[in-house]
Regions:
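Active-site phosphate-binding strand-loop segment of PLP-dependent enzymes
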Residues: 6-103, 109-119
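Short beta->alpha connector loops at strand-helix junctions that form conserved
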Residues: 1-4
Length: 121
């Protein structure tokens, strides 16, 4: 899904049409410390649950398309009082030299709690 014409956020009005039975993830990108509208993203993902075809036990447990955010340019930001890294199902942070937080290379992945997954998973 491309960006909107008046800002750098994804065009949420086109997201629903982009989800097909083959879609496994939506990957929003938080830019310049500004998180995406996760309420809109999750609303669309939930509305398309009937199309989702799981290919693994973890996808079955999630039961819908995963929301995997790129939060590298929003480290420390919040969405409605929740730190980025705890909003999407999974959030990735690159620590490349051009990112807001750098270790020259590397990165991390965070995830929010999901009652269908135990700590061992």
């Amino acid at each position: 899904v491309d960006i909107q014409t008046d800002n750098a956020e994804m065009d949420y009005s086109k997201l629903a049409d982009a989800i097909t039975p083959r879609t496994k993830a939506v990957i929003p990108v938080d830019l310049a410390g500004i998180p995406c509208d996760y309420d809109k993203i999750f609303e669309v993902v939930e509305s398309k649950k009937e199309l989702f075809k799981a290919n693994s036990i973890y996808q079955e447990k999630l039961g819908r398309v995963a929301v995997i955010a790129d939060g590298a340019h929003a480290l420390g930001s919040e969405y409605k009082g929740v730190k980025i890294g705890a909003v999407a199902d999974f959030t990735t942070f690159s620590f490349h030299a051009v990112k807001n937080f750098t270790t020259a290379e590397g990165g991390s992945v965070t995830w929010r709690g999901n009652p269908n997954f135990g700590n061992e998973e």
